[in-house]
Amino acid sequence: MRELLSKRPQPYYIYAPDYRRSASGIRVMHMLCDALIRSGHEAYVTAKVLSPEFMTPRLTDEVLEAHRSQGLEPIVVYPEIIDGNPLNGGVVVRYILNRPGFIEGAGHYGEDDILYAYSRDLLMPGISDDRVMMLPPFDLNVFRLPDDPAKRVAGKVCYYRGRRGELYIDPAL
């Protein structure tokens, strides 16, 4: 049975670069913070540039000090581009959004780090399938079928070629 004055849950610190709509990995980190807050958790981002689209309060010195004084140990979530533990978190989660080292970082993580992958093809050895957490970074207000079925065009397809355009698309499609 839950106590009336139960212990305050751990907050989440999301180590996220400044928001850019054009960078899907950055967008996903901001979306993660928003999703945690909408699920009733306390979460913050380290970014200075935020999106008005998401609930992403900044992690400030005042917030850090308040949590320290309350004896709270945050859960720190880093994207795969960050090596080490710059926020000195006791509980560290790595969100593998791309192949480690593809964009930045060398993929050096702590042996106690908890690993989650953005998709199945990014699962590293030892990570089970239940550690896939896919947050689609595209804006469904833009990339969706028209509401009016008469305006839908059969056979039209949209592809994302990836950061470096490495995806081969068969022209016959």
Regions flagged by a language model, labelled:
Residues 1-75, 167:
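N-terminal pre-catalytic "stem/leader" segment of glycosyltransferase-like enzymes
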Residues 29, 50, 66-169:
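Catalytic core of nucleotide-activated saccharide and alditol-phosphate transferases
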Residues 173:
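Donor nucleotide-activated moiety binding/catalytic core segment of transferases
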